[in-house]
Amino acid sequence: MKGSYKSRWVIVIVVVIAAIAAFWFWQGRNDSQSAAPGATKQAQQSPAGGRRGMRADPLAPVQAATAVEQAVPRYLTGLGTITAANTVTVRSRVDGQLMALHFQEGQQVKAGDLLAEIDPSQFKVALAQAQGQLAKDKATLANARRDLARYQQLAKTNLVSRQELDAQQALVSETEGTIKADEASVASAQLQLDWSRITAPVDGRVGLKQVDVGNQISSGDTTGIVVITQTHPIDLVFTLPESDIATVVQAQKAGKPLVVEAWDRTNSKKLSEGTLLSLDNQIDATTGTIKVKARFNNQDDALFPNQFVNARMLVDTEQNAVVIPTAALQMGNEGHFVWVLNSENKVSKHLVTPGIQDSQKVVIRAGISAGDRVVTDGIDRLTEGAKVEVVETQSATTPEEKATSREYAKKGARS
């Protein structure tokens, strides 16, 4: 009796389980049939035409540039300081009280312009004394010459002795010597008076005054009255490695003036352009460099004494050089290389030999030719033979490009 009871319960449980399984089977079938049209449509719209449920990987976006053939100037660069062509400390040559200053601080002056005046009173007095002594001695000389003429007539008749005649002749000569000394004294006094008016010895810009009106000054003062710096023209002194000396000398022998450019501290703005003036006659053994001097007209006052600048000297121009953006040049274990795009926008690595380069462009001596397209941005995840999408350089990225970049970044992060 108990066995039959248990058998009935087993049968009931089996029937319930079968019913539940049948329900889930039919429910899943209906769901798959309702989803089938959408899945088929999605498979048809798949750009790769691959298996259902597979998505095509987005192409890596890159920026590219075309290698061009052009003339490339070769520059030697160095750090330098602007120096005045001449620097003069204006000092007084005479002692006295400073009566007046005839310049404005920072003013441009010409050679001969009056800068200052010393009290001339004592020099006028000294000049008058010298002139008076000269006049007196000239009168004495005139009288001595008249006496000599009389002595010469009397000597012919033996009315005066030869000794007296010689004595008178000596007196005339002595007085003539005194006259010359008096004339020198007059010239000296006149010079002292002239020096009481202090003039500019060179063209240039005056600095700040070093002494005020009313002070007693002397020729021994080391500070002077004012300093004049000649800034038209003005010089640039910079250094080059000793290895560049041969290049500079060879360029000088070509007979053409070497152009030197002065750039600001950040090397972003050209201040002025001049020419090479000279090389120093020895190398600094401590630094292994040589000093170079260039001269600039500086009519626009773009350069100022003691100003720090970056110097660039043009020594040669390379004709028909293959040039690419510097951003395209990469360095790996094999050496320098670039990624080159073919007509299908597939990339391949090319080993290259770089030449002259700066922050913007680089000359490629071997490895690629003019007209080749090279990748300049988006290089990080490129692989040999990969197909890429070339995008234009834009100042502002579009929303579509941002989405593509994010999707590609996610894929790269997962790989």
From Swiss-Prot:
Which membrane topology term applies here? Peripheral membrane protein
Record's keyword terms, sorted:
Cell inner membrane, Cell membrane, Membrane, Signal, Transport
List the subcellular locations: Cell inner membrane
The UniProt annotation puts the region (Disordered) at 31-56, 390-415
Q: Where does the record locate the signal sequence feature?
A: 1-21
A cellular component term from Gene Ontology for this protein is: plasma membrane
What SUPFAM superfamilies does the database record attribute to this sequence? HlyD-like secretion proteins (SSF111369)
GO terms assigned for molecular function: efflux transmembrane transporter activity
- Composition-biased stretches (Polar residues): 31-47
Summarize the record's induction comment.
The mdtABC operon is transcriptionally activated by BaeR.
The protein's superkingdom reads Bacteria
Ranges of Basic and acidic residues composition bias in the record: 399-415
Q: What is its quaternary makeup? A: Part of a tripartite efflux system composed of MdtA, MdtB and MdtC.
Regarding protein family, the annotation reads: Belongs to the membrane fusion protein (MFP) (TC 8.A.1) family.
Relate the protein's function as given in its record. The MdtABC tripartite complex confers resistance against novobiocin and deoxycholate.
Name by which UniProt lists this protein: Multidrug resistance protein MdtA
What is the taxonomic lineage of the source species? Bacteria, Pseudomonadati, Pseudomonadota, Gammaproteobacteria, Enterobacterales
Q: Encoded by which gene?
A: mdtA
